Amino acid sequence: MSEIISVAFETNGKGYLGYLLDLPGAFVRGKTIDQALSKVEQEAIIYQKWRGLRPRYNLKPKVVQIHYSSLMVEDADSEILLDFDKEKMEEKEFNQYIELIKKSGFSILTIYKNTELKNWLDETRRRKTFYGDVPISIQRIFEHIDSVQYYYLSRISTDIEEKKGFLERREYCLKKLKAIYLRENNSKIYITDHEKWTIRKVLRRFIWHDRIHAKSMVKILKKQKWMGLIDCYQDPFNFFT
């Protein structure tokens, strides 16, 4: 018997970006909605392996929301506020998000620290996107992931102090988010730079952003191995294992 997994999509007509509601930060992409939906089960399996869960198979995706956007969705630009993002969040669930973001941070750092050729440039990745030049080395991707941590916090907080170190910045963001959560749960919708945010959306986007760029890091490592530049690499997210 198939198990239903809910998916919410954002599209501009040129590409589709889908979020798996039961798996915070899990996503699929495709030029068409059918192409994206065909990737749901594999994405769910990869995600559950990363979390140390027994993978569920025979999943049937159900589209529960479609948001039409003018953003460059084909480049993973996103603004969607999921209906799920607005729901009440129990403290147990909030803490699960926090632990996932910590785990994701450690996974990113594992890839980065174990990379031998951090500044090796993958010229095939060079192109322009909505946020500028695509980072084409693991060093640049890591720096981009790090810089975005404060961006997500700034969507619902203007009181931000600079901290040193990737994990230190992450821990600071999570403490600030917890303080906001304890004050208002997930009851408030913030509008920042014309985009709607809630605490749950910030938490979800933290994990999603880690995963989408970690996948690029591992793709570069996979290419380095194929070219004989390295013997092995770390893939804690299980993207290609």
Enumerate the predicted regions with their spans.
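Short, contiguous alpha-helical
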Residues: 7-15, 23-29, 39-56, 120-167, ...
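Short, charged, surface-exposed hinge/linker loops at domain edges
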Residues: 2-4, 45-94
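Short secondary-structure junction/hinge motifs that connect adjacent elements
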Residues: 57-64, 121-124, 187-189
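The catalytic Nudix box helix
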Residues: 36
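A short mid-domain helix/strand-loop element embedded in enzyme catalytic domains
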Residues: 76-88, 101-126, 142-151
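Acidic/histidine-rich alpha-helical segments that form the ligand environment
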Residues: 87-115, 161-190, 197-216
